[in-house]
Amino acid sequence: MGTHLHITAWVLGIILFFVAFALAGKNDKGAKIVHMIVRLLYLIIIATGVELYVRTGMKIPGFGGEYIGKMILGILVIGFMEMTLVRKKKGKSVTGVLIGFIIFAIVTILLGLRLPIGFHIF
């Protein structure tokens, strides 16, 4: 159940991130609301990730470092998401942080799929 909640929160977070990205920069009440929902999803993503690690990740020998690395990468992804939205809202260049978000998101997702708790695609 925890894995599904975590992945659902990530999928919703990424979808709403792109909605907020499209709305950012406009003085629109909807843009602020979507951005706040994305921030709430950040907290849910972090909470479910920590819960997954505490409940099962700590008990799997040989993967502790990879789980810690995935948590750090996940927090970096969230940081890049937030920096992208804030920079876009302020009218600054978002190319670098958007590329960073995409790279870190891909690496984090691939690492998550490789680890034993996630879905086993590899």
UniProtKB/Swiss-Prot annotation:
It is a multi-pass membrane protein. It is found in: Cell membrane. The chain crosses the membrane at residues 5-25, 33-53, 60-80, 93-113. Its main location: membrane. Pfam families: DUF1516 (PF07457). GO terms for cellular component: plasma membrane. The keyword Metal-binding does not apply. Keywords: Cell membrane, Membrane, Transmembrane, Transmembrane helix. HAMAP family: UPF0344. Belongs to the UPF0344 family. NCBIfam families: PRK13673.1-5 (NF010198). This is UPF0344 protein BPUM_1008. It comes from Bacillus pumilus (strain SAFR-032).
